[in-house]
Amino acid sequence: MKASLLKKLDVLSDRYEELTALLGDAEVISDQTRFRAYSREYAEVEPVILAFRDYRKVQADLEGAQALLKDSDPELRDLAEEEVAEARERLAALGDSLQRMLLPKDPNDGRNVFLEIRAGTGGDEAAIFSGDLFRMYSRYAERQGWRVETLSENEGEHGGYKEVIARVEGENVYAKLKFESGAHRVQRVPETESQGRIHTSACTVAVLPEPDEQAAIEINPADLRVDTYRSSGAGGQHVNKTDSAVRITHLPSGIVVECQEERSQHKNRAKAMAWLAAKLNDQQQAAAQQAIASTRKLLVGSGDRSERIRTYNFPQGRVTDHRINLTLYSLGEVMEGAVEQVIEPLLQEYQADQLAALGD
């Protein structure tokens, strides 16, 4: 393991001892805000320190076994050789585990997300594919035990959506979906194509982490224009009786959000405001993410919405992720919700990139 990483672990060990003392301090215990903060930090640090202690113990065992290699007793030397080999193997495994524990954590990984899918080039076929993508992500969410709530939808003339916006709620949603942002291209023969020609169309996907309520971005009410209108979504006859749908325009940025899925105007407004906060937060972080991508060339995590990230070729049953040159011939399974077949290799590639940069 790199000396710089061992130094980090030594510093973390000192912090662990400090946290242990703080959590036993009467003054801290009486201050619930500080106590909760230290408890969260302790819970994050403890597994790393326990693993580091195991690493140090195995390291000591290895040194002891290596010393026995010089013993005059041949049987003892043979036994020591076995112990050295075993200790080296365990040390390598523990070192690898510790490195992964030290990887910088994305503070948004545990967040819920707003999922935006928009039809791009390709007209009706692009709208139909938007619907297919939304169904794919909904099936994937179901497999993960997540909840999908549609906020806004603009249906295509021949099926699918020109645009569909949803909130996805559950455990580690952003961690799993954050690399789905970008342009998704489809190649297939449309049902209306009589000559059997393959058409190419595209959709864009944006995955925005929902800001934490306590760290939510401040929005000046004077910067907003709020319009209400009659919903055209679900809800039976009620939707035509009241102006329950809400459209909010953020004047400084020009960002427009709308929500029409709830019968209550108040609920629609609250959801639209949460979505607006996510979009403004995303806008603020875009420059920083571009800087990181340019310095470390994190192609997997660039998040560029215009970047073509994936192609779905229906005649060949093929799905290709262009960022990591991954090609799978299980398109049917992926479209039915087995998106983990693409997501897991992406996460592994990103983690490998982080490991390569760790300790630099």
Swiss-Prot record:
GO CC entries: cytoplasm
Residues annotated with N5-methylglutamine modification: Q237
Post-translational modification: Methylated by PrmC. Methylation increases the termination efficiency of RF1.
Cellular compartments annotated: Cytoplasm
InterPro entries the UniProt entry points to: PCRF (IPR005139), Pep_chain_release_fac_I (IPR000352), Pep_chain_release_fac_I_sf (IPR045853), Prokaryotic/Mito_RF (IPR050057), RF-1 (IPR004373)
One Pfam match: PCRF
Keyword Cytoplasm: yes
Keyword terms, alphabetized: Cytoplasm, Methylation, Protein biosynthesis
Gene Ontology molecular functions: translation release factor activity, codon specific
Domain of life: Bacteria
HAMAP family: Rel_fac_1
Family under the similarity heading: Belongs to the prokaryotic/mitochondrial release factor family.
Function: Peptide chain release factor 1 directs the termination of translation in response to the peptide chain termination codons UAG and UAA.
Full protein name: Peptide chain release factor 1
Species this protein is from: Pseudomonas paraeruginosa (strain DSM 24068 / PA7)
Gene: prfA
